[in-house]
Amino acid sequence: MFQNSMKQRMNWEDFYGPNLGYALELYDQYTQDPNSIDPDLKEMFDELGAPPSDIKEASGTKEKGRVTADLIQKIASAVRLAEDIRTYGHLNASVNPLRKDEKKSELFPLSDYGLTEEEIKAIPASVICKDAPKNISNGLEAIQYLRNTYKRTISFEFDHVHDFKEREWLTRKIESGELFQKNSAEKLSAVLERLTEVEGFEQFLHRTFVGQKRFSIEGLDALVPVLDDIIAQSVKSGTTSVNIGMAHRGRLNVLAHVLGKPYEIIFSEFQHAPNKDLVPSEGSIGISYGWTGDVKYHLGANRELQDAETKSARITLANNPSHLEFINPIVEGSTRAAQETRTQSGYPVQDETKSLAILIHGDAAFPGEGIVAETLNLSSLKGYQVGGAIHIIANNMIGFTTESAESRSTKYASDLAKGYEIPIVHVNADDPEACLSAVKFAVEYRKTFNKDFLIDLIGYRRYGHNEMDEPSTTQPMLYDAVRKHPTVKQIFAEKLVKEGVVTEEVVQNIEKSVTKRIEDAYQKVPSKKEHTACEIELPEPVSNGFPDVDTSIDFDVLRKLNGELINWPESFNVFGKLKRILERRAKAFDDDRKVEWSLAESLAFASILKDGTPIRLTGQDSERGTFAQRNLVLHDSETGKEFVPLHHLSDCSTSFAVHNSPLSEGSVLGFEYGYNVHSPETLVLWEAQYGDFANAAQVYFDQFISAGRAKWGQKSGLVMLLPHGYEGQGPEHSSGRIERFLQLAAENNWTVANLTSAAQYFHILRRQAKMLLREEIRPLVIMTPKSLLRNPNTVSEVQELSESRFQPVYEQSGLSHDYEKVTRLVLSSGKVSIDISDHFNKLEDGKEWLHIARIEQLYPFPAKGVKELFAKLPNLKEIVWVQEEPQNMGAWGYISPYLTEIAPEGVSVQYIGRRRRSSPAEGDPTVHKKEQERIVSDSLTRKN
């Protein structure tokens, strides 16, 4: 890049600082051996001569003069010194509030660079620091200015940022002094008042609710004014939605002061008192609880900001379990949804200004939890980037009882961010003004480059991990220092009084006012004895189950949609083999009238889009499909250009997004869940490459998707597609662990399906789309096929799409209707049902005693349909549940109590399948085949 820049500019006036220093070093090499450097550089030096080295030449005059090698070396050394200060100055900064008086040896003495004060004074300031203030007149002053700039109570790391323009911008912002402009007295007074509120709230809780967990913010009080300022600056720039993710540390304070959750509601949660009569005291706030609820320091909130300063914006603090950092991709997904407009065909239109993600991390969790790296990896990806998130490490330098040296292998908690070229600011949490400078830097960088930025807010933890902890047990010296250390409010108030910004009387009046507001709020809280326990009841729409939904669609509409799905521009060159496959789909409505799985999916998507519902589908290889079945995105075989037929449906004004995801389950599933929660009108689907890999995202299934509504009242209609089925591919490519989803199934929290026909898949997708904005909506887990994608026994008649609807219980076709002869009912779900069907159809006679049915929807259990099936079979003797999974896996453990409970009197319920195993499947395909044959044979063979 340097050579190209030189060749284009051909003028020394444009070179300064490190660029000029580099040029001087190369020129020194050139004078010793002209052929030892790049030919382009040699040509440059031949034409322009030496780079400027004295004041006149550096100022742009055309005076000529020979430059000695020694002078070149001195200038190069001075420039290298300046670069070292920029790169390593943070090592000398005063960012640890508990070590503010620690004396540090001066880094980078002139002697280490072979320089004296006189020599460096002779070098122009602009050579060393182009953006220094005008009062900096020479190289020595420039070096001292850089030392002071890079070792304050705020320090900077951006040497890992590779983009030249970004580095130049970052350098200019820091060295011009723009970040450190004095704040107005009004703003400083407001920050003091906020810090007084933060401290007063925590101290009141500490006195009033002795020993109760609250995960105090004390030691990092500045986090609240930092959030205030990020929100205010962003909203002034046009942001209308701010999404915040954080763990429990300091959460109650953020809820009270950033989200405006009334003190009295928080107090009532400590008091375990009813709060239904408490009315928010400021702003407009919405807080939703589920029927089982959650602890107070996990709850989220929404707030509508309405004032002249910040215009109008919705602030959301996401609900969060104690699983640290897992909220991060959820917040980013919500932010992406808020940024996108989905009311036009094609991909959604993204406006990154509309919404901002703020992610608050812990200093132990940021390097410790892998989900952090997974989420950072999304930051520049087409389907996931949010125009830059602002990260804040709430760094109290300890994780529970574990100190930094035990919790990470890096110097800073923030070092992971370097791998993603995220600029980093370390700032002392005891210096609120430095914190405001960090905010200004972060907001302006994001606005300029639409990239992530990280603030490492370094403070301490005044008490233990929770308020029942005694931290001196494990950190006696640290907590001796903490006890002696004044609060940030005390430090800041003293500073402002000393500077004449406020008087001591003003400080006292602020304290009295804050104390009164808090105590007045407490008086509104009913006493604990008024609280009466009551039985938890499900909301009626949830307890009533899924309503019957008409998902049929007119045959002619389907035919037209199919034609549009196989239509592309004449000049577009579809890959030959794929073209033949796609063109065969036309026959579905002309000749054979059969629809295979992937066509049923495309038709479902097309019809849902035409109905006005946006769709977002992501996953590893989801554009093509893991098994080359989907091909939603066509690639021109000659130009590589892309074409998406679903973007070109006639009379469609709804967006369709499909994205290949990174190789990550957790962050991607979390992102899609967040997108869906924020955009409930959108059909959001996440597809695992194989269902086996879904457990890499287990936290999201356990803590959010299955339980989010019960805990927080947080509805979701997310669809999860998990390829599942035993085909001899070994223990890592066979099982989506359906047993885990069924174990989590309760209170109609989601739907779990294991389907065997294209029509069933078509209808369940359409049913989900039609339910999205209804109270009855819930997530949908589908065990999708692999080899069955092309199995002729899974294809459906077109009429099954146009005239039917989803059937939770699906009877085998071709059965005898002499129900009185039936003594065994074979029930199964998923791929093994097709294996049973194949074997059954090969039986020549002796089949009258058998009846076969598939349970397509496992949860909620279709008791009504199964009972109706039993009623048809008056002489039934046994019900066998057949599965290909081991007995301790699959659906058996879940379904056997249901079947036993509703089975007719005297009818046994039996199991046929693999025995109990620790591994889900055999590694040897031959052994697999024998086991599969045994299972199918046993299910269709009469006992002796």
Swiss-Prot record:
E1 component of the 2-oxoglutarate dehydrogenase (OGDH) complex which catalyzes the decarboxylation of 2-oxoglutarate, the first step in the conversion of 2-oxoglutarate to succinyl-CoA and CO(2). Keywords: Glycolysis, Oxidoreductase, Thiamine pyrophosphate. One of its GO terms (cellular component) is cytosol. This is 2-oxoglutarate dehydrogenase E1 component. GO terms for molecular function: oxoglutarate dehydrogenase (succinyl-transferring) activity; thiamine pyrophosphate binding. It holds the Pfam family Transket_pyr. It comes from the Bacteria. Residues 914-944 are annotated as: Disordered. It catalyses: N(6)-[(R)-lipoyl]-L-lysyl-[protein] + 2-oxoglutarate + H(+) = N(6)-[(R)-S(8)-succinyldihydrolipoyl]-L-lysyl-[protein] + CO2. The gene is odhA. Its EC number is 1.2.4.2. Homodimer. Part of the 2-oxoglutarate dehydrogenase (OGDH) complex composed of E1 (2-oxoglutarate dehydrogenase), E2 (dihydrolipoamide succinyltransferase) and E3 (dihydrolipoamide dehydrogenase); the complex contains multiple copies of the three enzymatic components (E1, E2 and E3). Transmembrane segments: none annotated. Residues 925-936 have a biased composition (Basic and acidic residues). Gene3D superfamilies: 3.40.50.12470, 3.40.50.970, Multifunctional 2-oxoglutarate metabolism enzyme, C-terminal domain (3.40.50.11610). CDD domains: TPP_E1_OGDC_like. One of its GO terms (biological process) is glycolytic process. InterPro entries: 2oxoglutarate_DH_E1, 2oxoglutarate_DH_E1_bac, DH_E1, KGD_C_sf, ODO-1/KGD_C, THDP-binding, Transketolase-like_Pyr-bd. Its cofactor is thiamine diphosphate. Belongs to the alpha-ketoglutarate dehydrogenase family.
